[in-house]
Regions:
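Nucleotide-sugar donor-binding/catalytic module of glycosyltransferases
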Residues: 1-214
Length: 214
């Protein structure tokens, strides 16, 4: 596994963080273990008052790909926009700090986007329970007939009706920048993922969906 930082990585993975010490190590473990190694992992610490910043620094010492934006609390939208400003990758991915991803998640998503020359690639995902016993359940937003081929997402309303799940996708950074797609910076604003996902679908010329959960 490569732990070296690249000046122009394939993908920038944004992780917004606020008081998630309980879950953060599992999240970061899944990020640094990605089979797509040419990534930068941008941790945006939104004024955490627990041990989250110390955990981030611990991973920064072990892996040069891990970086931190350490700032006063300003909310999810501003945090994500700060991450987008720092991103240098050809693609942008998002990982919520209380979540984790399959080891090959980013590799699958980027490969699909590349093969279809898509503005974004998006996959199904699993619901996960750790108690009373570990189990997973596929949330099938996209049926096999809709997957693995380029589509124009705004041609049908079905894709606007799916869960936003902005973290089960990768986006071409130049596509986001050309279309001015950002998050609402207003502190406390709700449904940030919904507005971001809507703008992505409305602006994209081409997308590809994956049936596999990531």
């Amino acid at each position: 596994m490569s732990t070296n930082a690249s000046d122009s990585p394939v993908l920038s993975l944004l992780i917004p963080i606020y008081n998630v010490q309980r879950y953060l190590r599992e999240c970061l473990d899944s990020a640094v273990a990605q089979t797509l190694e040419d990534i930068e992992i941008i941790c945006i610490n939104d004024g955490s008052t627990d041990s989250s910043p110390d955990i981030i620094r611990e991973y920064m010492e072990r892996d040069a790909r891990v970086k931190m934006i350490d700032k006063a609390n300003s909310g999810y939208g501003d945090s994500m926009n700060r991450g987008l400003e720092m991103a240098r990758g050809e693609y942008v991915g998002i990982l919520e700090s209380d979540d984790f991803m399959a080891p090959d998640a980013l590799e699958k998503l980027v490969s699909a986007a590349e093969s279809c020359n898509a503005d974004f690639a998006k996959a199904n995902f699993d619901f996960y329970w750790s108690k009373p016993e570990e189990r997973r359940s596929l949330h099938e937003m996209f049926k096999p007939k809709d997957c693995g081929k380029p589509v124009h997402p705004s041609d049908t309303t079905q894709f606007f009706k799916q869960k936003p799940s902005i973290w089960s996708a990768v986006y071409r950074r130049d596509f986001l920048e050309r279309n001015g797609i950002k998050f609402l910076p207003t502190p406390g604003a709700s449904f940030q993922d919904t507005s971001f996902a809507f703008k992505v679908i409305a602006c994209a010329d081409k997308a590809v969906y994956l049936h596999d959960a990531v």
